[in-house]
Amino acid sequence: MISRIKSFKNALNYDKMNCIEIILRRNDLMSTSFENKATNRGVITFTISQDKIKPALDKAFNKIKKDLNAPGFRKGHMPRPVFNQKFGEEVLYEDALNIVLPEAYEAAVTELGLDVVAQPKIDVVSMEKGKEWTLSAEVVTKPEVKLGDYKNLVVEVDASKEVSDEDVDAKIERERQNLAELIIKDGEAAQGDTVVIDFVGSVDGVEFDGGKGDNFSLELGSGQFIPGFEDQLVGAKAGDEVEVNVTFPESYQAEDLAGKAAKFMTTIHEVKTKEVPELDDELAKDIDEDVDTLEDLKVKYRKELEAAQETAYDDAVEGAAIELAVANAEIVDLPEEMIHEEVNRSVNEFMGNMQRQGISPEMYFQLTGTTQEDLHNQYSAEADKRVKTNLVIEAIAKAEGFEATDSEIEQEINDLATEYNMPADQVRSLLSADMLKHDIAMKKAVEVITSTASVK
C-alpha cells in the first residue's frame, strides 16, 4: 500500500518546465524520469537497483520460511537455494516489491521535486532476475494557484455582537430541557414523547434483514426512522399494536428495498414524556452550582454569550475574508482526485464516529434512508471548498515566504499538548517537523488575510 505523498518543500512549477522529460541519476544507481502528460498529470518512471532488491527478497523469504516444508529439512528450515530451485525466486517478487516500493517511490517523487496530491497508479514495466526493476507511476500533482488580492479586503458579514434577553432565556431553556426526566405516561403518545417499541418489518409478507428491533427507544419527531414511520405512532398507547405502513425512498441503501412498500408490525411497550423542572432559583442552582439565584444565572450566561458572540463575529469576518481571497484567486485545472480524496476522508471520519457509537454503516443507511452516494454528495461541496481554500492559503504562505522558527514549532507543540491533554513528547512523536512547519506557515497566511480585512 502506497501512502499518500505530500512534499511541500519542493513544489514543481510547470510554467518553468521547458522540457517534456527530466532524467536524473542518483548515487544508488536509481534512474528517475518524469513525463508530463497533461496539466497536473504525468508519469514517473523509476528503477530499483539490486542493492535494494536483494535485502527485500531476503525479507520476503524470511516472512514465509517458517511455513515451508522440504524433504530432509525440518519445517521452517528450508535453505534458500533449495527454495529457489523448487519454486523459483520469482514467487518472492510480489512481497519484495511491497517491501521496497514505498521508499523507492517516495525517493523518486522527492528527487523530481513533485508535489503529489493523490494515490498513484503503479505499474511494473520490467522485473527480471538479477536486473534492476523498472516501474511507472501515474501521478496527479498540485495545481498552480494564481493569487489575486488577499490583503486589505472589505467584507460583509451577517453576524452581530449583540446578545438579547431572548438569547439568554433560550440558553436557560435548553439547560432546563436537558434536566428533564422521562416519566411513564398513561395516555396517548404525542410528538416529542418517547415510545419503547418492538417492530418487525416485511415487504410483501416477507421479513427482511435489519427490519427487526426489540425494546427500541424512539423519540417521535426525531426523524430517526424513514419518513412516515414516527407519525403513525402518534396517538398510540402502551400495549397497543400498530401496523405502520411506509414506502422506502427510491434512493434507499438496500437496493432490494428501495421504492418498495413495507409494513412494520409495532408493539408499544411504554410511552414516556418529558417532565421539566420549574424555572426558579432551585433550577438555577441545579444548572450551575456557582450561582444562588435565577437572576445570577442570567447575568453569568449573558457574559458567556457575549464572549461567544464576539468569537463568532470574529470567525465570521475571518471566514468571509478567506472566502473572498479564494474567490480572487485562480486555481489552474484543479484535479478532481483532490476533491475525491477529501470527500473520502470526511466520509471515513464520519463513519468512524458512527461506529464508535455502535452504529454500523449498514444500520446508519437503513435508519436514515440514505445511501453511500448520498453521503458522498453531502460532503462534496464542502470538500471542494476546503481543498480550494487550503491551496490558496498555501500559495499565500509561499508568496509571503512564511517559515516557522524553532521557537514557534516548540510553542505549537506545547499548545497542542495542552489542547489535547497529552505530553509534549507524544505530540512530537505523532507530528513530523514538516507538518508543524506547514501548519504554522498556514496560520501566518490566514493572519495576513484576516488582520488586514475590514467590515463594510
Swiss-Prot record:
InterPro entries the record matches: PPIase_dom_sf, PPIase_FKBP_dom, Trig_fac, Trigger_fac_C, Trigger_fac_C_sf, Trigger_fac_ribosome-bd_bac, Trigger_fac_ribosome-bd_sf, Trigger_fact/SurA_dom_sf
Biological-process GO terms, alphabetical: 'de novo' cotranslational protein folding; cell division; chaperone-mediated protein folding; protein transport; protein unfolding
Cross-referenced PANTHER family: TRIGGER FACTOR CHAPERONE AND PEPTIDYL-PROLYL CIS/TRANS ISOMERASE (PTHR30560), TRIGGER FACTOR-LIKE PROTEIN TIG, CHLOROPLASTIC (PTHR30560:SF3)
UniProt feature coiled coil, ranges: none
Entry note about domains: Consists of 3 domains; the N-terminus binds the ribosome, the middle domain has PPIase activity, while the C-terminus has intrinsic chaperone activity on its own.
GO CC annotations, alphabetized: cytoplasm
Entry's EC annotation: 5.2.1.8
Listed PROSITE patterns: FKBP_PPIASE (PS50059)
Keywords assigned by UniProt, alphabetized: Cell cycle, Cell division, Chaperone, Cytoplasm, Isomerase, Rotamase
The UniProt record lists the keyword Metal-binding: no
Major location (coarse): cytoplasm
Pfam hit, one: FKBP_C
Species name: Streptococcus pyogenes serotype M4 (strain MGAS10750)
Record SUPFAM superfamilies: FKBP-like, Triger factor/SurA peptide-binding domain-like, Trigger factor ribosome-binding domain
Domain PPIase FKBP-type: 192-277
Single GO term (MF): protein folding chaperone
Location of the protein in the cell: Cytoplasm
Catalysis: reaction(s): [protein]-peptidylproline (omega=180) = [protein]-peptidylproline (omega=0)
Membership in a protein family: Belongs to the FKBP-type PPIase family. Tig subfamily.
Name assigned to this protein: Trigger factor
Gene name in the database record: tig
Signal peptide: none
